Amino acid sequence: MSSATVLDSIIEGVRADVAAREAVVSLTEIKERAQRAKPPLDVMAALREPGIGVIAEVKRASPSRGALAQIGDPADLARAYQDGGARVISVLTEQRRFNGSLDDLDAVRAAVSIPVLRKDFIVRPYQIHEARAHGADMLLLIVAALEQPVLESLLERTESLGMTALVEVHTEAEADRALQAGARVIGVNARNLKTLEVDRDCFARIAPGLPSNVIRIAESGVRGPADLLAYAGAGADAVLVGEGLVTSRDPRSAVADLVTAGTHPSCPKPSR
């Protein structure tokens, strides 16, 4: 019987898809395109603004829920998020399980003036140059998907291109690995990508062990302002919200409600 996890299956598909894209656009060419792209925006400054920041996600589907929303125009959705006060727009680009694409990333980048995060399963340097070529200011690195030397190498390459890495963890041991690699922004995902199970107490366990100079982002489980406030109380600097926004009838207002809660005087402030 196979012991392969959900994460293993996703990465297998990602590797095949990256190889197919590289057969069309070489590493040399994608590097040249990345160099020609507009300089990346300052993600760290955006995330350090007062209050609890909102990273709003363009997310068509997920492995745990299947199709989430029919997003006719990701640019319109991204503009709604920006108008609602989001600090960063996250765009899923993994195509097999999340129905994302680099076309979505292109559309969002052209539509908004705030930083954009490429959310994918980054396993090869090619994808980092690809992210920059398509206008990303930030990208996701998942500790559980990467051996330590690879994590450190990909993080270094990300920062060498002027981008910011959101380094995702699910356990205290993964958080230690992220810090060892030099992560400046750590996202704690309540969902275990190997099993898809959700542990809502995950952030509260891990965040107190992170240095005060690390930006702490809570991922998964934000359905409204109450969840944002709970994460703020546990030490979050920002929350990443996908499903709760793409399934909303009014995404702009949904983001605005979160932003209002995150900047309210009663909202717990991150310790710095």
From Swiss-Prot:
One of the protein's GO biological processes: L-tryptophan biosynthetic process
Gene3D superfamilies associated with the record: Aldolase class I
Disulfide bridge partners, by residue number: none
Organism for this UniProt entry: Mycobacterium sp. (strain KMS)
Record-given protein name: Indole-3-glycerol phosphate synthase
PROSITE patterns: IGPS
Keywords assigned: Amino-acid biosynthesis, Aromatic amino acid biosynthesis, Decarboxylase, Lyase, Tryptophan biosynthesis
Gene (UniProt): trpC
Family per record: Belongs to the TrpC family.
Pfam families, A to Z: IGPS
Enzyme Commission designation: 4.1.1.48
Pathway: Amino-acid biosynthesis; L-tryptophan biosynthesis; L-tryptophan from chorismate: step 4/5
GO function term, MF aspect, one: indole-3-glycerol-phosphate synthase activity
Catalytic activity reported: 1-(2-carboxyphenylamino)-1-deoxy-D-ribulose 5-phosphate + H(+) = (1S,2R)-1-C-(indol-3-yl)glycerol 3-phosphate + CO2 + H2O
Stored InterPro entries: Aldolase_TIM (IPR013785), Indole-3-glycerol_P_synth (IPR045186), Indole-3-glycerol_P_synth_dom (IPR013798), Indole-3-GlycerolPSynthase_CS (IPR001468), RibuloseP-bd_barrel (IPR011060)
